[in-house]
Amino acid sequence: MSSASSAGRDTRSEILSQPEIWETTLKQLVSGESGDLPDLGSYDYVLFTGCGSTYFLSQWAARHCQQVRQVQAAALPASELLIFPSAWLRPGARGLLVAISRSAETTETLRAVEAFRELTKGDTLAITCNPQGPLAKRARWVLAAPHAQETSVAQTRTFTSMMLLAARLIDGGHAAQAHSALPAAARALLDQYGELAEAVGRDLQLDRFFFLGSGARYGLACEAMLKMKEMSLSQSEAYHFMEIRHGPMSMVDGRAVVLGLMGVEGRNYEARVIADMQTLQARTMGLSPDGAGAAGQISLGAEALPPIWRDPLYLPFLQLVAFHRAVAKGLNPDRPTHLEFVVKLDG
């Protein structure tokens, strides 16, 4: 990968450091440093909440929670829980709120926790990169990765590290397997496809990006969309794979990029969507565990891992595309327009 300008230096470093950061995070999880955690099966329902990136992480986690643990689970922005608590909270049922915040200081998330505790008296668990923050102090349990903390505004390695923390909560039995396979797969992915990410990101003839994901990967497609939008100020959208046919593909043409976060289940359906977008002249790429299923595939590796542990591999390549596009447009991805590291509300 060619050297970047000083603009975006922190973001680039944080993206490329993910193999080492994951190694540290997984070692922590395997060693038992995370301590005792709640039994998700003992709850009537589990809510995952966050804001922005961590809301998308919540979408991903809730889907895996419901599928892996067979527990009723949902994701919602913290503001929805704060403004419409009666639509979501069940005072007569035993619920767990999993609140996710990089900083542990986001006002909406803190207030959502207060509303949950006041109305349900239920348990709360915090997932964060700041174990000393107010969110961590208000939660019964804390899963934290302080070593992953960033200086950049846009979340990259914190997001994927908090994915690993959520995976430990939902499917802790495979943490050791992930520790053995995931960091090496991330290194190989960055080495093999880093130049491709740069080439796609720097191609300013492309002017719109579509990110597609099925199941839990829809939350990751939304996160990739947000990275492209906030870093590079580019038109970017996220959809469930087959939903792009129901209107959005009217925007697909030779200046569009369609990036599919492909899985094993539903692969034939997803491959057909990618093929359809190719006929509309879009540039297409599919990211999949084994590199099979469609033309222009990126092989993530670690295909033996359960999906919840393998899923972080979808993001480094997509983060790099957004980073290089920002730099090519003369922007500073470390400091996206109008954004701050933490959103704090007055009053």
Per-region residue spans from a language model:
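Phosphate-moiety recognition in structured ligand-binding domains
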Residues: 2, 6-11, 139, 257, ...
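Active-site phosphate/pyrophosphate-binding segments
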Residues: 7-9, 13-14, 19-42, 141-257, ...
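Glycine-rich phosphate-binding loops that contact phosphosugars or nucleotide phosphates
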Residues: 41-184, 249, 259-303
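Short glycine- and Lys/Arg-enriched binding-loop motifs that mark or flank ligand-binding interfaces
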Residues: 46-48, 100, 209-211, 243, ...
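Alpha-helical transmembrane segments of integral membrane proteins
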Residues: 49, 213-216, 309, 313
